[in-house]
From Swiss-Prot:
Residues 1-22 form the signal peptide. Its EC number is 3.2.1.23. It is an enzyme of class 3 (hydrolase). Substrate binds at residues 90, 135-137, 195, 264, 372. InterPro entries: Betagal_dom2, Betagal_dom2_sf, BetaGal_dom3, BetaGal_dom3_sf, BetaGal_jelly_roll_dom, Galactose-bd-like_sf, Gly_Hdrlase_35_cat, Glycoside_Hdrlase_35. Cleaves beta-linked terminal galactosyl residues from gangliosides, glycoproteins, and glycosaminoglycans. Pfam families: BetaGal_ABD2 (PF13364), BetaGal_dom2 (PF10435), BetaGal_dom3 (PF13363), Glyco_hydro_35 (PF01301). This is Probable beta-galactosidase B. The keyword Lipid metabolism does not apply. It is found in: Secreted. It catalyses: Hydrolysis of terminal non-reducing beta-D-galactose residues in beta-D-galactosides.
Length: 1020
């Protein structure tokens, strides 16, 4: 709501600001709160938390894509270490609700409460986005799969059936979150309603209301409020499409407190052609214009990006390893600074950590990996993009004046080079300015040198004044500051980028950085002398004393150098590589801590935390190898502990402690061997009895789905039979006749990259192998390769995999058989249809891993993939064999148990590699093919969908907690051969990295790996 408070964007800057006063914006912007609390406020400039302005820099991760609660701390510590002030999560209604009326917020990773307590403990604000629809390339966009039958109406509108279905989840999750709101002493600052739902108007120009959409949004808001949510409500419009839910545009039903915009300027998928209709022709590094849109959409609210591109998902058939080429460190450098140039003051990267689509969590668009080319990779490694993002997030955290700026210009007129554009941002209260420089044509990758005209408190200047020109080298942007406060000091200007600062023993330590080999220049006010404390790694050094300032010009080679000013202020000069491993680590858990109560550490791969106990400085973090470390800390520090061990200090001169940490940590995996194998498709045998609890007889004659099936059979859609994910098995019978059928026509829908195979009386009659984009297939299969029975029923078996439910309105698209028709000289009908479900159907026998982990294969139903299963029916696989093979068409399960013993103090990242015959892997000695589908299970978790005929993913990271790092690990692989020529795969595992770490990777994760239970036998 609008309230009477206002913030004046004033002119009180002083006459010394040449040419600035005339440009200042004197608009009086209203200061808003939601009428329930003023703990979180906002205006045209930024969010205010407890009265203090914040530049909110956040990033997203999904707890349900890393189902190990102990590792959530690992991720949050890495997010905190980089300088992010916040993080964001989606909740997942479908993950928490296996059946109507049932909610699970307790078992394993379903209990996400620890994320909110960790946010408080570690010191990060939290943006929570509970849906009920989240998209997220999740199965059905995060809706429970039991809602996809059509029985609940259109979904995502005010249909009473849908509202009744969602209310238990929505009310309960609001109650769970409420105690952790910032208004109740927690760190949750914003609560999102729905997701990318630009459905407020039937006609935006006339504001003809979309009543169903408005009432739906209002209902969600009301229920959240009724259940304790008093934080500001937000929403994220997609891709500058639409003008919904903004209080600045209307007083219509359903408006939220703060509206934001999601944008993926490169493309949200590696297949960039999918984004052409939204972003236009794909041009690498071409930025988009948000400034004008925000002025139109939300002029009295902060320019807010609840999702900005942190990477892209890799679709079926996409490149092995993802699409990082145009989404790497250069992307982070250019695009995130470009947002700042457009006055965006609240950013959340999607994704900061992507994780894994284990089980059947993925939508039809993606395979197992959800790495997303994120700054933190799927295996939790910090990649170069993380460090390149970190040098900006460290800056925005301490650049307090950046949270209130007007954009006074944006053109090439500031620059001496017409190829370089500059946006001038200025704080109307302090006069601090930020000049964001980039190529005028952002896709340009040229090297450009230039000077910049700036206005400062000491007049108009062209900078640098003495040194070499500023350089933009390729796809790069730089933020040049003027009148920048750090502690009690002021930078008149700096052409080197500010990284961070700290006030230690009452003296400022400022870190500046330039790319290796480039020049920088800075002027500090209030002091007129400087000296280089370390000249060993710089060149072309010039010091220019002034009457009341000192200017230093430098060219930075690799590493770190130190300049000391006459009053004891220290300036740390860094090249890019050194800046990447220069950490600003607070001594407290205040998310807003900026410069005080901070130590600076250079060298480690990661610094997680710092604590000063008496004169003991205790640091925790990770080391890749032997590393020389420099620590800027109070002079009172008498000892340094790293990960609980006292270090040997080499030097402690001038308040800089140097030491060497770590060694060359190593770990070798045991060989995976001892495989045993069994049939996992007994259902094709004529003597198989489909009478166990796994089977349901299809008797329903009318479908609730908006896409009705053919009327010649009962409803064969899996969801209407309480079966939702994975592989599905149909078993149909039809009688023998004198003029038997010759073919069967099948029309099956399974989503992108799905497939199916068909058997008649145990004889294989064909497969649809699928494609990366085909969601439905109809095909006629001949019976010429099968033997029809002359005196008893014939048995037709269809095995399909349901790749997932579609997103948005497509969630209602059916899964399963739409039409099955016998063809021949006579008239035929099936006697009976049965479907095999997962063990327990919607009453899952394994609530820890449920409800998206298991399908209906025999091996899954009886629990061969689970720890503790006695594999008595198995056959030994030859110890000389490096391959798992299936002769002919069929499905087999392979299983082994391998122990691990990872020493305490190591973070060992492990990935499985699955390969099949191809021209780039290996040639099968027996002529087996890659026409197969395999599922990788690790201690009961399905952690890999391997479809070599379609997809290119071969590496499958599996985290500790799923893997038992100090015990036996049950590894199972189901191999579905879809060809008469048989199939072959090789399974191995590799160490991705080994780090010495403070993080306890030997936590007790046994509760996450429940074993086999006897009840499984009832689903054979």
């Amino acid at each position: 709501m609008l309230i009477s408070k206002t913030v004046l964007s004033g002119l009180a800057l002083g006459a010394s600001f040449v040419g600035v006063s005339a440009q200042q914006n004197s608009t009086r912007w209203p200061l808003h709160d939601n009428g329930l609390t003023d703990t979180v406020e906002w205006d045209h400039y930024s969010f205010l938390i407890n009265g203090q302005r914040h530049f909110v820099f956040s990033g997203e991760f999904h707890y349900w894509r890393i189902p190990v609660p102990e590792l959530w701390r690992d991720l949050l510590e890495k997010i905190k270490a980089a300088g992010f002030t916040a993080f964001s999560i989606y909740n997942h209604w479908g993950y928490h609700s296996p059946k109507p009326g049932v909610l699970d917020f307790e078992n394993g990773a379903h209990n996400f409460t620890s994320i909110m307590t960790l946010a408080k403990e570690i010191g990060l604000y939290m943006i929570i986005r509970p849906g009920p629809y989240v998209n997220a390339e999740a199965n059905a966009g995060g809706l429970p799969l039991w809602t996809t039958t059509g029985a609940y109406g259109k979904l995502r509108d005010n249909d009473p059936r849908y509202l009744e279905a969602l209310t238990p989840y929505w009310a309960n999750i609001s109650k769970i979150i409420a105690p952790h709101l910032i208004t109740n002493g927690g760190n949750v600052i914003l609560y999102q309603i729905e997701n990318e739902y630009a459905e407020q108007w039937l006609d935006e120009e006339t504001h003809e209301p979309n009543t169903s959409g408005q009432e739906y949004m209002q209902y969600l808001e009301d229920v959240a409020r009724e259940n304790g949510i008093d934080a500001p409500l937000i929403h994220n419009l997609p891709n500058m499409n639409g003008h919904s839910w903004s209080k600045d545009l209307s007083n219509a039903t359903g408006n939220v407190d703060v509206i934001g915009v999601d944008s993926y300027p490169t493309c949200w998928t590696c297949n960039v052609s999918e984004c052409a209709s939204t972003n236009g022709e794909y041009i690498p590094y071409k930025t988009l214009i948000y400034y004008d849109y925000f002025k139109e959409l939300s002029p009295t609210q902060p320019s807010f990006m609840p999702e900005f591109q942190g990477g892209s998902y890799n679709p079926w058939g996409g490149p092995q390893g993802g699409c990082p080429d145009d989404l790497g460190p250069d992307f982070a450098n250019l695009f995130y600074r470009n947002l700042i140039s457009q006055r965006v003051s609240a950013i959340s990267l999607y994704m900061l950590y992507g994780g894994t689509n284990w089980g059947w969590h993925a939508s039809t668009d993606v395979a197992t990996s959800y790495d997303y080319s994120s700054p933190i990779s799927e295996n939790r490694k910090l990649i170069e993009k993380y460090y390149e993002t970190k040098v900006l997030t460290q800056f925005t955290k301490i650049a307090q004046d950046l949270s209130k700026v007007d954009r006074l210009g944006n053109s090439t007129k500031y620059s001496s080079n017409p190829a370089v554009s500059v946006a001038e941002l200025r704080n109307p209260d302090t006069g601090a300015a930020f000049y964001v420089t980039q190529h005028e044509y952002t896709p340009s990758g040229t090297v450009e040198k230039f000077t910049v005209k700036v206005n400062t408190s000491e007049g108009a200047l062209t900078i640098p004044q003495y040194g070499s020109q500023i350089t933009l080298n390729g796809h790069q942007s730089k933020i040049i500051v003027t009148d920048f406060k750090f502690g009690s000091k002021t930078l008149l200007y700096s052409t080197a980028e500010v990284l961070t600062y700290a006030v230690i023993d009452g003296k400022e330590v400022l870190a500046l950085w330039v790319p290796t080999g480039e020049s920088g220049e800075f002027t500090v006010k209030g002091v007129n002398s400087a000296k280089f404390a370390d000249k060993g790694r710089t060149a072309n050094i010039e010091i220019h004393p002034g009457a009341n300032n000192v200017t230093v010009s430098f060219m930075q080679r690799s590493g770190m150098s130190l300049v000391e000013l006459g009053d004891g202020t220290r300036i740390v000069l860094l090249d890019r590589s050194a800046a990447h491993v220069f950490w600003s680590t607070p001594l407290n858990n205040d998310p807003a801590e900026a410069g005080n109560n901070t130590v600076l550490v250079h060298g480690p791969y990661l610094v997680r935390s710092a604590k000063l106990e008496g004169c003991d400085l205790k640091l925790t973090g990770d080391i890749q190898n032997s590393t020389e470390v420099s620590i800027f800390a109070p002079k009172s520090v008498c000892s340094v502990n790293w990960n609980g061990k006292k270090t040997s200090v080499k030097s402690a001169k001038g308040g800089v402690i140097t030491t060497t940490l770590g060694g060359d940590a190593k770990f070798e995996l045991p060989t995976i061997s001892g495989w045993k194998s069994a049939d996992s498709l007994p259902e094709i045998a004529k003597d198989y009895s489909a009478t166990s609890k796994a089977w349901v007889v299809a008797t329903k004659t009318n479908s609730s789905n908006p896409t009705p099936p053919a009327p010649n059979n009962p409803v064969l859609y899996v969801d209407e039979n309480d079966i939702h994910v994975g592989n599905h098995i149909y078993r149909a019978t039809f009688p023998s006749t004198d003029e038997p059928p010759t073919d069967v026509y099948l029309n099956i829908t399974g989503g992108r990259a799905f497939s199916y195979s068909v058997w008649l009386n145990s004889d294989f009659i064909g497969s649809w192998l699928g494609t990366a984009t085909t969601e439905q297939n109809d095909q006629t299969f001949s019976f010429s390769n099968a033997t029809l029975s002359t005196d008893e029923d014939n048995i037709l078996v269809v095995v399909m995999d349901n790749s997932a439910h579609d997103l948005r309105d497509g969630a209602l698209n059916p899964r399963g058989i739409t039409n099955a028709t016998l063809i021949g000289p006579g008239s035929y009908s099936f006697t009976e249809w049965k479907l095999a479900g997962n063990a327990g159907f919607e009453d899952h026998l394994d609530p820890v891993r449920a409800p998206l982990n298991e399908g209906s294969l025999y091996a899954e139903r009886v629990g061969i993939h689970l720890p503790g299963y006695e594999f008595d029916e198995a056959e030994e696989v030859s110890s000389n064999s490096t391959s798992l093979t299936v002769p002919g068409a069929g499905i087999r399960v392979f299983r082994t148990v391998v122990p691990l013993s990872v020493p305490q103090g190591l973070d060992v990242s492990i990935s499985f590699r699955l390969t099949a015959p191809s021209n780039v892997t290996f040639t099968s000695a027996e002529g087996y093919t890659n026409q197969l589908r395999a599922l990788l299970f690790v201690n009961g978790y399905q952690y890999g969908r391997f479809n070599p005929y379609i997809g290119h993913q071969i590496d499958f990271p599996v985290p500790p907690g799923v893997l038992d790092y100090n015990g036996d690990n049950t590894i199972a692989v189901t191999v579905w051969s879809q060809s008469v020529d048989g199939a072959e795969i090789k399974v191995d595992w590799n160490v991705d990295y080994v780090h010495e770490t403070s993080f306890d990777m030997n936590f007790d994760g046994a509760y996450l790996r429940p074993g086999w239970i006897e009840e499984r036998r009832e689903y054979a």
